[in-house]
A protein has these predicted regions:
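Pyridoxal 5′-phosphate
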Residues: 1-272
Length: 272
């Protein structure tokens, strides 16, 4: 996603590093393409769990192991998957893992989550706010300015983290996701997208093989490209999907049902 490009481009310019972008593999096997690019010249790999345009899946356990073998670091933005697809941090072993709270986390805008590996939990934060300083919980002593930070990853918190509007929404979303179960969400959505993919293939809309994409994500491509006005026509039918790159991105959730799928397919038949 662009957010995971711009920040690294800026950092590379500051420190004289080179950004290497892996082009879309012809076979759409991103894992093999990433593994082939890893060598001793790599310092950091900034990756998702699945691609934001079509759901192309990456084997993060294999990639993480390959990076550690050459002394490189793994930074993950899993906004496109967290909340809908399981990830085992103990096996992947990312150095940093970030995710926005909205999208599959079902939370509000303006919040995000950050995991920091133990070896980086004593680093210097990007934001110099007061609440991340040592002893900030003692309001009576705030006049005694502190140079040290809160222990561990707490030092990386944003300012105004005690947001009385956003935090309750985020907590409610997390509780709902845990109640449903992430593995069950993935299994249910994988069945739903497989059904959509099968019905759309006869319309000339081609999905990635199920083995190469995340179960909750479907990107449909068409030879010759998607027709102009596609989204506007679907919107007029009350159907909300998006185009990302050359893919018609279809990402249903648990609230979508068979009738929604039938409505989508019927509308696509009229357009295509």
């Amino acid at each position: 996603f662009p957010s995971n490009v711009y920040c690294w481009s800026e950092r590379a310019a500051q420190c004289g590093a080179e950004i290497v972008t892996i082009p879309i593999p012809a076979d759409h096997d991103w894992t093999a393409a990433v593994l082939a690019a890893i060598d001793e010249t790599v310092a950091v790999a900034a990756l998702p769990h699945n691609h934001w345009t079509d759901g192309s899946l990456l084997d993060l356990e294999a990639i993480g192991a390959a990076l550690r073998a050459v002394g490189a670091k793994l930074v993950l933005d899993i906004t496109q998957s967290i909340g809908a697809m399981p990830i085992d941090v103990a096996k992947v072993k990312p150095d940093f893992l970030v995710a926005a709270c909205y999208k599959w986390m079902l939370g509000p805008y303006s919040l995000g989550f950050l995991y920091v590996a133990p070896e980086f939990q004593e680093g210097e934060p990007l934001e110099y706010n007061w609440i991340t300083r040592a002893g900030a919980e003692d309001f009576s002593a705030l006049v005694d300015y502190a140079d040290d930070y809160q222990p561990g990853a707490r030092r990386y918190d944003m300012g105004e983290r005690a947001n009385f509007s956003l935090m309750p929404m985020a907590i409610a979303a997390l509780e709902q996701l845990l109640d449903w179960g992430i593995a069950d969400i993935q299994m249910t959505l994988a069945a739903r997208t497989a059904d959509i993919a099968g019905k759309c293939e006869s319309l000339g809309l081609m999905p990635l093989p199920q083995s190469l994409r995340a179960g909750h994500f479907l990107g449909l491509r068409r030879e010759g490209g998607l027709p102009k006005g596609l989204l506007e026509t679907l919107l007029a039918e009350g159907i909300y999907i998006s185009v990302r790159g050359s893919s018609l991105r279809v990402t249903p959730h648990l609230f979508n049902n068979d009738a929604d799928v039938d409505k989508l397919v019927a509308a696509l038949k009229k357009i295509l």
